[in-house]
Amino acid sequence: MSKRDFYEVLGVSRDASERDIKKAYKRLAMKFHPDRNQGDDSAADKFKEVKVAYEILTDAQKKAAYDQYGHAAFEQGGMGGGGYGGGGQGDFGDIFGDVFGDIFGGGRRGGGQARAQRGSDLRYNMELSLEEAVRGVSKEIEVPTLVECDICDGSGAKAGSSAQTCGTCHGHGQVQMRQGFFAVQQTCPTCNGKGKIIKDPCNSCHGQGRKQKTKTLNVKIPAGVDTGDRIRLSGEGEAGEHGAPAGDLYVQVHVKEHNIFERDGNNLYCEVPVSFSMAALGGEVEVPTLDGRVNLKVPEETQTGRMFRMRGKGVKGVRGGGVGDLIVKLVVETPVKLSSRQKELLREFEETCCGEAASKHKPKSEGFFSGVKNFFDDLTK
């Protein structure tokens, strides 16, 4: 079956820029990627076709050869042997891994010695109370992970033996295959890219060099952390392959809601109830802080919702910047479950203080009802 023109495959003109080619490739690769089309062989074929077209058209030398000779430049026996296409010479994800890596994070290694892979990073979600987050705390945690095998010291080989250099790739982890004018690297099928072969594997880790284990760690949480902060423990992630460096452990902080305080940055907020008599006459009210109780002076004629700032009673920031404040909102409480005598006294108070002739005692009401009157007067004009 004749091969489609590479420009047609990507849906671009022959004078398209490299940027346009790359843009078209990304769109089509996402559309036909096997992970999105599991079990669809036609999508897999289109995905491979798109990758090959992109690899040729973004390489100046290959593109020039294709523009001059077309598909014949890469056909087996046509110009140097080897082909770019075909059904089964290895995994196309390995052949063009570096091309596709910018989208899916892949990519092939260079031509040097194969390197063992660094261990994966891990994440641990830690929940703290507000007090723990503000003051700092040490916590013991248990983390399931992969650790270096203590029997073979991570080599994967049985005691008295060692891993042997792969005879196929000579330790490089890759082999070359010819494609027309060009040589393309592919993951070694013998050692799977590791560069070494373990002929006598360790019985404990079965040649992997790592084993599953739950580690117990003591984590020191600095004072002032907040939800979203992340603490890095270097080298406490999964062990690397065959002696490679371990990954890191990231402790993700989440601070639980508090029944009194709310936090915003380094400031704390709370509501404190006061009686309506204290709000009218003034006095002192006890206010909770993270360091204990303190007294707040309430001026006379205080209205509900009034805010007071208590400097230095907030949180000391984990990144510096000083200590925040405690913002106190006073809420005037309406008395409930009154006795007959209390109700009688309030009615007397209402007559002397809150009647129509006593508007000076209720400034908010006077302003409100005056505004309402003006509103309706304007409507009737």
Swiss-Prot record:
The J domain is necessary and sufficient to stimulate DnaK ATPase activity. Zinc center 1 plays an important role in the autonomous, DnaK-independent chaperone activity of DnaJ. Zinc center 2 is essential for interaction with DnaK and for DnaJ activity. Homodimer. Keywords: Chaperone, Cytoplasm, DNA replication, Metal-binding, Repeat, Stress response, Zinc, Zinc-finger. A zinc finger (CR-type) spans 136-214. CXXCXGXG motif repeats lie at residues 149-156, 166-173, 188-195, 202-209. It comes from the Bacteria. It comes from Vibrio atlanticus (strain LGP32). The lineage of its organism: Bacteria, Pseudomonadati, Pseudomonadota, Gammaproteobacteria, Vibrionales. Residues 5-70 form the J domain. GO terms for biological process: chaperone cofactor-dependent protein refolding; DNA replication; protein refolding; response to heat. InterPro entries: DnaJ (IPR012724), DnaJ_C (IPR002939), DnaJ_domain (IPR001623), DnaJ_domain_CS (IPR018253), HSP40/DnaJ_pept-bd (IPR008971), HSP_DnaJ_Cys-rich_dom (IPR001305), HSP_DnaJ_Cys-rich_dom_sf (IPR036410), J_dom_sf (IPR036869). The keyword Disulfide bond does not apply. Its cofactor is Zn(2+). It holds the Pfam family DnaJ_CXXCXGXG. Belongs to the DnaJ family. Its main location: cytoplasm. It is found in: Cytoplasm. Zn(2+) 1 binds at residues 149, 152, 202, 205. PANTHER family: CHAPERONE PROTEIN DNAJ, DNAJ HOMOLOG 1, MITOCHONDRIAL-RELATED. CDD domains: DnaJ, DnaJ_C, DnaJ_zf. Binds 2 Zn(2+) ions per monomer. This is Chaperone protein DnaJ.
